[in-house]
Amino acid sequence: MLRRGVKIGVLTNNENKFIELKEIAKNFNIELEHLRGEKIEIQSDDLEEISRTAANLAYLIFRRPLIVDDSGLFVQALQNFPGPYTNFVKNTIGLKGILKLLEGIKDRSAYFMTALTFTDGKIIKTFIGIVKGAISEEIRGNLGFGFDPIFIPEGEKRTFAEMSLEEKNRYSHRARAFAKFAEFLESYTEKE
């Protein structure tokens, strides 16, 4: 069991991801603290395995309750590429590269998935969040990060990058995974 009021550490080198998680956490009265350090990522096709392994290794270093988030963009017409290699693909071929790969393809359906793993050294639990949508025809918007400028969530006409953080979090894969984590944390935290 976790003591009420304990800050949960977040290991990420992505400042935007931490800001997004901190904003989501406010809705659940959960305090997060940014842990600075190298997130060790194994090579795997499974986001959950990547997230769980990174959380276990992070706990060995920080020795405190923490979460690790690994996310990916899965494009149906590209056989779910880039998937767990999303960050690498973003840093190499980028948004324009994905759009180029989809030139002339009508089915632009895709989804974002987050595997958010919590550990406190006693337990390890992973929470999955998914948002379905499609890849836009062009880069649109200047908010958000990563592939936000080309991802349109289901039920929307705008990309994530055309939405405020609050609007994005109504749809976000990360917000959905965090909501499951918050529900778990409520039952796992000691009652006063």
UniProtKB/Swiss-Prot annotation:
The keyword Magnesium applies. Substrate binds at residues 12-17, 71, 145-148, 168, 173-174. Binds 1 Mg(2+) ion per subunit. One of its GO terms (cellular component) is cytoplasm. It comes from the Archaea. Its EC number is 3.6.1.66. One of its GO terms (molecular function) is XTP diphosphatase activity. Keywords: Hydrolase, Magnesium, Metal-binding, Nucleotide metabolism, Nucleotide-binding. One of its GO terms (biological process) is purine nucleoside triphosphate catabolic process. The active site is at residue 70. It catalyses: XTP + H2O = XMP + diphosphate + H(+); dITP + H2O = dIMP + diphosphate + H(+); ITP + H2O = IMP + diphosphate + H(+). Its cofactor is Mg(2+). Pyrophosphatase that catalyzes the hydrolysis of nucleoside triphosphates to their monophosphate derivatives, with a high preference for the non-canonical purine nucleotides XTP (xanthosine triphosphate), dITP (deoxyinosine triphosphate) and ITP. Seems to function as a house-cleaning enzyme that removes non-canonical purine nucleotides from the nucleotide pool, thus preventing their incorporation into DNA/RNA and avoiding chromosomal lesions. Belongs to the HAM1 NTPase family. Homodimer. HAMAP family: Non_canon_purine_NTPase. This is dITP/XTP pyrophosphatase. It comes from Saccharolobus solfataricus (strain ATCC 35092 / DSM 1617 / JCM 11322 / P2).
